[in-house]
């Protein structure tokens, strides 16, 4: 009997091993009322090398939507400049989904590559709600760096967590998440 692992992928090739890194900034975390403000995307290979940094889009929202953000978002999105960028943006949610879908289709095949990021299950919920066609392009599995962080704190408390700036802008958060996973790869998964 063979001990070679089997995979559910139709073809295992370099393209099928890619990771689709996404980060969203939202008006809050309440899926029933909050919305996406910013989305960035980066494609990496299995070794965490960046293949291409994709669009980093700020979606226009009304002042009414911005006024109803929770206190944390009002403070942090105000400090980061995101609130003002949202006011000035000309990009609709529909346009943003179309642009992101074109980008991800250029680099991945439908249903093959996982969504990656930090606490990315939250991003996935908002993608399913607001950008379902984009979300459906991705595999149902996710690579969540925050899971590794939490397990490392418990199982390897002597290994320091990588330092992060936490600027709360989408592209910067993705870049930090990729670096964080690289760090865990050499310290925890050695």
Swiss-Prot record:
Protein source organism: Dictyostelium discoideum
Q: What Enzyme Commission number(s) apply to this enzyme?
A: 3.1.15.-
User: What positions constitute the catalytic site?
Assistant: 140
Highest taxon of source: Eukaryota
The record's section on InterPro entries has:
Exonuclease_RNaseT/DNA_pol3, Oligoribonuclease, RNaseH-like_sf, RNaseH_sf
Reported function: 3'-to-5' exoribonuclease specific for small oligoribonucleotides.
Gene that produces this protein: rexo2-1
A cellular component term from Gene Ontology for this protein is: mitochondrion
Using the record's annotation, list all stretches that form the Exonuclease domain.
19-181
| Name listed for the protein in its UniProt record | Probable oligoribonuclease
Family designation: Belongs to the oligoribonuclease family.
Stored Pfam families: RNase_T
Would I find Nuclease among this entry's keywords?
yes
Task: Tell me one GO molecular function of this protein.
Answer: 3'-5' exonuclease activity
Which of UniProt's keywords are assigned here? Exonuclease, Hydrolase, Nuclease
Q: Does the keyword Phosphoprotein apply?
A: no
């Amino acid at each position: 009997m063979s001990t070679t692992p089997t995979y559910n992928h139709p073809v295992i090739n370099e393209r099928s091993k890619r990771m689709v890194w996404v980060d969203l900034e939202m008006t809050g975390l309440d899926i029933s009322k909050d919305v996406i403000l910013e989305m960035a995307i980066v494609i990496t290979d299995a070794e965490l090398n960046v293949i291409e940094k994709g669009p980093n889009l700020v979606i226009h929202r009304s002042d009414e939507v911005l006024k109803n953000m929770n206190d944390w978002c009002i403070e942090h999105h105000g400090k980061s400049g995101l609130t003002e960028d949202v006011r000035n943006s000309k990009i609709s949610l529909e346009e943003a989904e179309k642009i992101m879908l074109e980008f991800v289709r250029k680099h991945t095949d439908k249903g093959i590559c996982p969504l990656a990021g930090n606490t990315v299950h939250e991003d996935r919920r908002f993608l399913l709600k607001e950008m379902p066609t984009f979300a459906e392009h991705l595999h149902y599995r996710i690579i969540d760096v925050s899971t590794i962080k939490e397990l490392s704190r418990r199982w390897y408390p002597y290994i320091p967590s990588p330092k992060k700036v936490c600027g709360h802008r989408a592209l910067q958060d993705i870049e930090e998440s990729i670096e964080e996973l690289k760090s865990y790869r050499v310290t925890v998964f050695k």
